[in-house]
């Protein structure tokens, strides 16, 4: 799997890195790993939460069995742990923050989740061998690196031919509401966010680490960029990745009245990138819907 021998510390494969941006991001997450677990979380609760989430449930179904999956920017490995439960897949949880991975590793050990490997390192280092993973997941991470496009190109080197890559990025238009809240947060403080941030309203008020982790990630991150649908489509074209679908869908006018849960299911079904006008409209509509209220993240699925 690796091009070089790692140090193994507390069941985590550790590679040293010196990149300044990576070091800055690592330091940012050190005290408040993201996403953090609820106090009561265990194997059963992670499965329950994952199965209740249309995106994660259908992602797991789409992946199937007997696959090698790399999650880049795994954080505390909630998704990696969920994807590893109840199948014979091999999951690699990859992040630059050792403290975050340690939380995920301890959770896996405590709950006897054995088909998961934890790797600490920088995406720009030559850590993994090429063409070894069936799925590469990079949801909400590439826009926190020093170069979104270069990090994407690096990640697909590790993807097998006919493998799938799922990329999630902040949207230039769809993130407007979060950016607006960010400015008000600087003036009004945390209490304002507890009332007006829809994600924080859902979190148990006693789960302070989880609350603090969300606030830091969404409103105080030192390295952050936003992108458009067309930027990702151009990146897919440049790297010879076939477009499968997106969420929200590029095909604004082809919406058959399905709710957002149904639209998330369609992320894993072959669609069309539509035309420029439809793509712009879809991104504008994000502002007024759930994706726009919860951070403005959009997803693109591609095939190598």
Please annotate each region the language model reported.
Residues 97:
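Conserved SAM/SAH-binding beta-strand->alpha-helix loop
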Residues 41-65:
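Conserved alpha-helix/loop element of class I SAM-dependent methyltransferases that forms part
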Residues 125-135:
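A short acidic, Gly/Pro-enriched loop at the edge of an enzyme's catalytic core
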Residues 164-199:
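Conserved class I S-adenosyl-L-methionine
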Residues 210-303:
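Rossmann-like AdoMet/SAM-dependent catalytic core
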Residues 76-87:
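Conserved SAM-binding loop of SAM-dependent methyltransferases across substrates and taxa
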Residues 112-124:
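Conserved SAM-binding strand-loop segment of SAM-dependent methyltransferases
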Residues 149-161:
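A short glycine-rich, Lys/Arg-flanked "PGG" loop and its adjoining helix->strand segment in the class I
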